[in-house]
Amino acid sequence: MTKKKISIGIVQENPIVGDIEGNLQLAINAIDKLSKQSSPDIFLFTEMFITGYPPEDLILRDDLLDASYEAVEKLCEVKPESFIVIGYPKKEGDSIFNCAGVLRN
């Protein structure tokens, strides 16, 4: 049985709280940079990367939650053959969760 090695690219960036578009671009740039260096199978981002951390009361705004989800959807298209693990908030009913999304298109 042949074992396949999995490479993980860990992204250490400093997303700005509330800057969804800027943080999305920061994520895309990090993926591009890591792809050129080592082409990892998995790109691993930090907690609440999409919104920046800590989002505090911004997390209660529906427009921020909607923008976060849209950013995650866009991120799915960036590197469809790889896995992207990234933190973002998700609303389910009246609850808001601190999620780690595992993305692959």
What residues fall within each predicted segment?
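Hydrophobic structural segments
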Residues: M1-N105
